[in-house]
């Protein structure tokens, strides 16, 4: 069942709501929507609204706190067994067709401070991070009962995209200056983007694209979270909370 932003916010902040929400967490795996379409599925079936799950329609403000620019993504090699591509960061990615749905990087652009400084401009703030008409689109969505959402890159996930899991985990100990500079850059850009937006319209929900899970537990310990990740999260979260964003911070698995 579709619920509006007021109902969602009432529920998520422990207000009055007649029943628990029933949601599907992640949706179809990569590649399934295309397969289902070929089999005749409707768009409502593909986005799962046809099956009785609760959902709130979200509007992500058209502003970009992520990497902006970079290389043109190209296919380097396509064989029956795998696909090799080059992404916007310059990484070589390999997708094994028989056993994977997400390509894995074979190399990474950041190994030390000099290599980070070469791509750092892709993460710094500029007015070009705002799509024309972003405010009008957000106001229209709000008037239709949509949840107004902001996103920030993950405090672990984005550095791991730049460095890889192993190199990042070593760098926390061997090159903390590098990690602090990456986090400060991400934090400054996210803060300035959502500072400008929240002066014009209230954000309902701040989400973070995070992934620090390993097979046996977190890939990062509490000491590293306290030093590197927590200050980054709080920089934007405290801003939005002071501007009226309710106590909602995380991912929105039920939103479409």
What is each model feature region?
Residues 93-94, 102-104:
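A short local loop/turn or secondary-structure capping micro-motif enriched for an aromatic residue
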């Amino acid at each position: 069942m579709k619920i509006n932003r007021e109902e969602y916010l009432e529920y998520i902040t422990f207000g009055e709501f007649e029943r628990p929400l029933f949601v599907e967490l992640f949706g179809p795996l990569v590649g399934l929507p295309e397969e289902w379409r070929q089999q005749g599925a409707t768009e409502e079936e593909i986005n799962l609204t046809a099956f009785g799950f609760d959902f709130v329609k979200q509007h992500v403000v058209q502003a970009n706190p992520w990497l902006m620019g970079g290389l043109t993504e190209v296919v380097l090699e396509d064989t029956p067994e795998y696909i090799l591509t080059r992404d916007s960061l310059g990484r070589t990615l390999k997708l094994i067709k028989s056993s994977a749905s997400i390509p894995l990087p074979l190399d990474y652009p950041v190994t030390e401070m000099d290599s980070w400084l070469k791509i750092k401009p892709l993460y710094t703030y500029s007015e070009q991070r705002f799509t024309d008409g972003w405010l009008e689109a957000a106001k229209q969505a709000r008037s239709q009962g949509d949840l107004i959402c902001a996103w920030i890159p993950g405090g672990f996930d984005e550095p791991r995209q730049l460095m890889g899991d192993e190199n990042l985990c070593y760098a926390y100990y061997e090159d903390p200056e590098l990690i602090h500079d990456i986090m400060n850059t991400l934090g400054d850009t996210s803060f300035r983007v959502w500072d400008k937006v929240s002066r014009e319209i209230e954000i309902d929900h701040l989400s973070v694209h995070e992934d620090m899970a390993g097979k046996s537990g977190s890939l990062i310990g509490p000491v590293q979270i306290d030093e590197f990740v927590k200050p980054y999260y709080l920089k934007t979260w405290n801003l939005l909370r002071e501007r009226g964003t309710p106590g909602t911070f995380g991912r929105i698995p039920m939103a479409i």
